[in-house]
A protein has these predicted regions:
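Mature extracytoplasmic/periplasmic domains
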Residues: 56, 107-110, 271-275, 307-381, ...
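Extracytoplasmic "Venus flytrap"/periplasmic binding protein-like
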Residues: 56, 60-124, 156, 160-161, ...
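Extracytoplasmic/periplasmic substrate-recognition and gating elements
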Residues: 59, 161, 233, 240, ...
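A structural signal for short loop-to-beta-strand junctions that line the ligand-binding cleft
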Residues: 80-81, 88-89, 118-156, 185-189, ...
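Hinge/lid segment of periplasmic solute-binding proteins
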Residues: 94-149, 173, 179, 200-202, ...
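Extracytoplasmic/periplasmic solute-binding protein
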Residues: 134-144, 149, 173-220, 263
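Conserved C-terminal helix/tail region of periplasmic/extracytoplasmic solute-binding proteins
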Residues: 159, 335, 366-432
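Glycine-centered hinge/linker elements that transmit conformational signals in sensory
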Residues: 178, 217-247
Length: 432
C-alpha cells in the first residue's frame, strides 16, 4: 500500500511553497527547537519502508524531526520545487541522467567530508563519477541500494532437466535450443511497453561496450555505430527464442506468463521479482548474468545505483543531515530495505541477499559490475522506442539504419552538452 502523502500533487506543493519559505526554508527549525530534515525520495514502492524509518528515527532522536516524502511522481515534483527554490534537505534518487543534470546545475552539496562514505563499495562510487558530464572534484551522493539485471530463470525447471547456467553467448544459444527441443518456451518479453526493450539491451551492452561510451562519444573519440553493432545484433537475436509477437505483450503480461511457467527464462531486472511473486508466491526464481561475450572472463553484471542520497547544496543543517544519513546506513536499516525490495546494498558488509540473486552473488561480492548504459541517455531521445522500432524492422539494412539514427539523434539531443564537454577538454588538455 502506498503511503498517504503529506502533499499529493505538484499544485499542492506550489501552494505551500511560500509558507515553507517563510519558515526559513531548508531544514527549518520547529517551535520546539528541533531541526527538521526533509527527504524526498523517488521510490513510491518503498514508501512503507520509509514510513518505518521515519518513525524509528524520530522515536530515537530528540533534537531532529525527520520527514520522508515518497510521492508517486517524485522527479516531476522535485523539478517543480527546484524552479521555485523550495528545496528539501536530502533527495533520494537513482544514479541516472537526472542525477547528472542536478549535479551539472550545482544543486548538490559536496559531501566528501562525510565519514559514512568509507563504508560504501568503491564500485558504486565510481559509477557515480562516470555520471559526471565533466570531471568534478568531490562526492555528491551516498550510493545506498543497487539493482541487478540479467536473466531470471525458473530454478525448478532447470533442475528437472539438468540444465546448467550458460557462461558464454554460444552456451546461451545452445541452452535456448535445448529448451525449445524440450517443448518449452525459452524467453518471454513484454516489448509492448517500450521501456522493457532496454532490459536485454543494457545487460548485453555492459559486456560488449565501454562503460564510459557516452562520455567518449561526447568527447568526439568514437561513435555509437562503432560500438553498438554487436549489442544491437545480439539483442535482436534473442527474438529467435521469444514467444510469438513479443510486441503484443506488456511488462505485466510477461511477469504473469513467467510466473505461470509459460517461459523458462525472463531477461529483466531484479525489480520484476515482487510482481512475479504476486502471481505465484511459490515460484523458485534464481538469476544469472547475461553472457553476451564468448569469453566468460568478460562477463559483467549489469548493476547501477538504484537509490542514492544527496544533500542539497543550500541545506542549512549539514550536521543533522549527516546524522540522518548515518541512521540510513545502520546495518539494520540497510538489511530491512534489502528484505523489503530485494535490493543489492552499496554498503560493505555481511548482508543477506534475496535467494533469487544467488547466481549473481559472486559478481556483487567481487564488484564485477557495470552501470546501465541507459542511465546516460537523455529521456527525450527515447532510446527505448528506438530499440523497439529497430527490433520490429525486418529489412536487410535495419541495423545500419538504427546505428546511424542513434548517432544522429545523440547529437540532436546533446548538442549543448557535447559543446560543453569539448570546451572543457580544450581547457584541460591533460585530463584523460
Amino acid at each position: 500500500m502506498k503511503r498517504c502523502m503529506k502533499v499529493t500533487t505538484a499544485a499542492g506543493l506550489l501552494a505551500t511553497a511560500g509558507l515553507a519559505a517563510a519558515l526559513s526554508g531548508c531544514g527549518a527549525g520547529e517551535d520546539d527547537g528541533k531541526v527538521t530534515i526533509e527527504i524526498v525520495q523517488y521510490k513510491p514502492e518503498a514508501a512503507t519502508y520509509f514510513d518505518t524509518v521515519e518513525e524509528r528515527f524520530n522515536s530515537t532522536h530528540d533534537d531532529i524531526e525527520l520527514i520522508i516524502d515518497s510521492p508517486n511522481d517524485a522527479m516531476t515534483i522535485l523539478k517543480t520545487r527546484f524552479i521555485r527554490e523550495d528545496y528539501p534537505d536530502i533527495i533520494g534518487i537513482g544514479g541516472d541522467i537526472n542525477y547528472s543534470n542536478f549535479l551539472d546545475s550545482d544543486l548538490l552539496m559536496d559531501i566528501s567530508d562525510y565519514e559514512g562514505l568509507d563504508s560504501i563499495k568503491q564500485t558504486y562510487l565510481d559509477i557515480d563519477k562516470e555520471l559526471e558530464f565533466v570531471p568534478m572534484d568531490g562526492v555528491y551522493a551516498v550510493p545506498y541500494m543497487a539493482n541487478a539485471a540479467g536473466i531470471l530463470y525458473n530454478r525448478d525447471v532447470f533442475e528437472e532437466h539438468g540444465w546448467t547456467i550458460p557462461t558464454t553467448w554460444d552456451e546461451l544459444n545452445a541452452l535456448c535450443q535445448e529448451i525449445q527441443d524440450a517443448g518449452l518456451q525459452p524467453f518471454y518479453f513484454g516489448f509492448k511497453d517500450v521501456w522493457t526493450c532496454l532490459a536485454p539491451w543494457n545487460a548485453i551492452s555492459v559486456d560488449l561496450a565501454p562503460s564510459d561510451l557516452c562520455a567518449q562519444v561526447n568527447r568526439g573519440e568514437t561513435t555509437f555505430a562503432e560500438n553498438y553493432r554487436e549489442v544491437a545484433e545480439k539483442t535482436r537475436a534473442l527474438l529467435d527464442y521469444a514467444q510469438e509477437d513479443p510486441f503484443a505483450y506488456s511488462y505485466n503480461d510477461a511477469c504473469t506468463a513467467f510466473a505461470r511457467g509459460e517461459a523458462v527464462m525472463y531477461p529483466i531486472g531484479s525489480y520484476a521479482v515482487p510482481q512475479i511473486q504476486q502471481v505465484n508466491p511459490d515460484i523458485n526464481i534464481d538469476s544469472f548474468v547475461m553472457p553476451a561475450s564468448n569469453n566468460a572472463e568478460e562477463n559483467v553484471l549489469n548493476s547501477g545505483n538504484d537509490l542514492q542520497f544527496s544533500v542539497m547544496a543550500n541545506c542549512e543543517h549539514k550536521e543533522e543531515a549527516y546524522e540522518v544519513l548515518d541512521f540510513l546506513l545502520e546495518d539494520e536499516t540497510v538489511q530491512d530495505y534489502i528484505n523489503d525490495q530485494n535490493a543489492v546494498p552499496c554498503k560493505e558488509g555481511d548482508f543477506e541477499l534475496a535467494p533469487m540473486l544467488d547466481g549473481m552473488k559472486s559478481y556483487i561480492e567481487e564488484g564485477k559490475v557495470a552501470d546501465y548504459q541507459d542511465h546516460h541517455y537523455p529521456s527525450e531521445m527515447s532510446v527505448d522506442a528506438m530499440i523497439q522500432t529497430y527490433l520490429l524492422d525486418d529489412s536487410e539494412n535495419a541495423t545500419d539504419t538504427f546505428l546511424e539514427r542513434f548517432d544522429t539523434e545523440w547529437v540532436r539531443y546533446n548538442r549543448d552538452l557535447i559543446r560543453k564537454v569539448q570546451d572543457y577538454m580544450e581547457e584541460h588538455p591533460d585530463v584523460e
